[in-house]
């Protein structure tokens, strides 16, 4: 709890409230100064909407009205000013440079919808309703159905008119999560059918070939996050299905998890004398690498620890939960 309290200071010091969409600053951050930057990003590195949900939930638990107030300001500002003409998120906005990135990614769009469905479900449980947000998110999920290819994949990048910029399907599993969540929240079976179709693609093109690629956005190559997302996508469908279907998805989650774990360090990398991280005593065991292009450690984990703990129980395979503890 003490560590959460310390980390919650991020929500205070990074909050930017003088732009058309309020956000938590963190993209392009200079670690020497931690000064606020002009970049508002919905998913990927910025994760502004998921951070807002985390700040709201934690703020209410701790009776921190400052965190709660700012979280609602972010959600309200994005509802009013955070969408493109077609209705996708303006996923990256550069305020001082005065431009919005015109190319959308299924990764950031999916992570934005994922965050909003967490927010809406939490608010529903508290007896609070947000019909305008529900309308927006349902519209986005419907656009996902339109964007999905016949083979079940989603294009990695696209424009506001649905024209394709990067047809690679490696980012597909990022869409599976909000589709399953949308099915649960809106009780719309089309979203579940779409989610199942994504995993048909994943099984055929990624999991069966052990070829996981193009999920991260700072490179376009084989990467950790494609396997991590594939495992998590299959896990979500296992939770949403029963019987033989559930068992099949669980098996896919396990197979992809084995590959994802190969990206995580099982040892502490030695540093040369004088290197800052070595001098600070950084231990790399449990940290993940990123991709074959970006060879550095990375904090990305999110749902995957839950997936590992679930797999440990599902298959009585304790090494999954053991390594989840190492990562945590």
Q: What do the PLM-derived regions correspond to, one by one?
A:
Residues 2-14, 63-81, 125-146, 187-204, ...:
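Extended, well-ordered alpha-helical scaffold segments
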Residues 9-13, 199-212, 216, 241-328:
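Non-catalytic carbohydrate-binding regions of carbohydrate-active enzymes
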Residues 33-38, 43-85, 98-110, 123-142, ...:
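Aromatic- and glycine-enriched glycan-recognition loops and surfaces
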Residues 49-65, 111-129, 174-189, 229-245, ...:
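Well-ordered alpha-helical scaffold segments within catalytic/enzyme domains
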Residues 1-12, 47-56, 240:
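Extracellular/surface-associated beta-sandwich interaction domains
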Residues 96-100, 118-189, 197, 204, ...:
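Active-site lining segments of carbohydrate-active enzymes
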Residues 30-48, 95-111, 156-174, 211-232, ...:
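Solvent-exposed loop and edge beta-strand segments that line ligand/cofactor-binding
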Residues 1-43, 72-73, 77-94, 138, ...:
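Low-complexity, Ser/Thr/Pro/Gly-enriched N-terminal "stalk/linker" regions
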């Amino acid at each position: 709890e003490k560590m959460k309290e310390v980390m919650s200071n991020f929500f205070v010091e990074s909050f930017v409230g003088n732009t058309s969409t309020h956000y938590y600053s963190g993209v392009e951050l200079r670690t020497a100064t931690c000064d606020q930057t002009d970049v508002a990003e919905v998913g990927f590195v910025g994760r502004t909407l998921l951070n807002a949900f985390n700040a709201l939930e934690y703020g209410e638990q701790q009776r921190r009205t400052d965190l709660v107030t700012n979280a609602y300001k972010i959600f309200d500002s994005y509802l009013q000013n955070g969408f493109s003409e077609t209705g996708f998120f303006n996923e990256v906005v550069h305020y001082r440079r005065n431009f919005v990135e015109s190319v959308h990614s299924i990764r950031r769009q999916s992570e934005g919808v994922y965050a909003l469905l967490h927010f809406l479900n939490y608010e529903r449980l508290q007896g609070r309703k947000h019909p305008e947000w529900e309308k927006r998110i349902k519209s986005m999920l419907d656009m996902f159905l339109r964007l999905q290819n016949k083979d079940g994949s989603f294009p990695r990048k696209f424009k506001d008119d649905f024209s394709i910029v990067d047809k690679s399907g490696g980012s597909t599993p990022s869409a599976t999560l909000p589709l399953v969540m949308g099915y649960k929240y809106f009780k719309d079976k089309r979203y579940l059918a779409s989610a199942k179709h994504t995993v048909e693609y994943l099984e055929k093109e990624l999991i069966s070939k052990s070829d996981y690629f193009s999920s991260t956005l700072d490179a376009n190559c084989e990467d950790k996050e494609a396997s991590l997302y594939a495992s998590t996508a299959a896990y979500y469908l296992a939770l949403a299905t029963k019987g033989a279907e559930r068992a099949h998805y669980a098996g896919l989650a396990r197979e992809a998890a084995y590959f994802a774990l190969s990206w995580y360090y099982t040892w502490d990398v030695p540093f040369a004398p004088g290197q800052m991280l070595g001098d600070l005593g950084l231990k790399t065991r449990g940290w993940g690498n990123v991709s074959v292009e970006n060879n550095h450690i990375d904090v990305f984990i999110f749902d995957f620890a839950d997936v590992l703990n679930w797999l440990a129980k599902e298959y009585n395979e304790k090494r999954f939960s053991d390594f989840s503890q190492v990562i945590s």
